Structures are given as structure tokens and as C-alpha cells.
Amino acid sequence: MSTTSSKVAIKPLEDRIVVQPLDAEQTTASGLVIPDTAKEKPQEGVVLAVGPGRFENGERLPLDVKTGDVVLYSKYGGTEVKYNGEEYLVLSARDVLAIVEK
């Protein structure tokens, strides 16, 4: 079972995970710089911490993701959190769409 282990002092509960979004491309192919206000929200990030899983029928269900995985997640899923000057995303495991294979 994957349990919480993190590089960050945020410990997610139940089936939640803490993700650090990867920076989206900052310039276009032709070299134009895209301002922050026009950027798409990233949908890819690195898992920094994993909760212990949720209970169902008295048993804890393990999560499919683990710390260090690069995941694709729902565009509008999760809650943005700023902690110690860093921005993180706290997602429910159901908001994770896929794990990116290395």
C-alpha cells in the first residue's frame, strides 16, 4: 500500500494526493512569450505526497499513484494551495487521469 511520504510538509488525507504542477511552455513555436494571464492551466505534475487511501466496507483501498509519479490530471480538479512560497495542487485520486511512463 502506498502511504504518505513527502518532500513537503503537507500530509494528504484519505484518497488525496499533493502534486506540484509542471510549468507549461512559456513561448510559442515562433518565439512569442505567453503572458501568465493567457496561459492554460497545467494538467501535468509530479506527485509529492500520497494519502493512505479511503475506507470502503471497513478496508482501506490503496491508491494507484505513488510519490515521484508524473501524472496527468483533470483541468479543473483539485484545490490550489500555496505553502512556504510554493504552489501545490491537492487532488482527489479520482481527478488523476493517467500516469506518464518514463
Curated annotation (Swiss-Prot):
It comes from the Bacteria. SMART domains: Cpn10 (SM00883). CDD domains: cpn10. GO terms for biological process: chaperone cofactor-dependent protein refolding. Pfam families: Cpn10. GO terms for cellular component: cytoplasm. It is found in: Cytoplasm. One of its GO terms (molecular function) is protein-folding chaperone binding. Keywords: Chaperone, Cytoplasm. Heptamer of 7 subunits arranged in a ring. Interacts with the chaperonin GroEL. Together with the chaperonin GroEL, plays an essential role in assisting protein folding. The GroEL-GroES system forms a nano-cage that allows encapsulation of the non-native substrate proteins and provides a physical environment optimized to promote and accelerate protein folding. GroES binds to the apical surface of the GroEL ring, thereby capping the opening of the GroEL channel. PANTHER family: 10 KDA HEAT SHOCK PROTEIN, CO-CHAPERONIN GROES. Belongs to the GroES chaperonin family. NCBIfam families: PRK00364.1-6, PRK00364.2-2, PRK00364.2-4, PRK00364.2-5. This is Co-chaperonin GroES. It comes from Streptomyces griseus subsp. griseus (strain JCM 4626 / CBS 651.72 / NBRC 13350 / KCC S-0626 / ISP 5235).
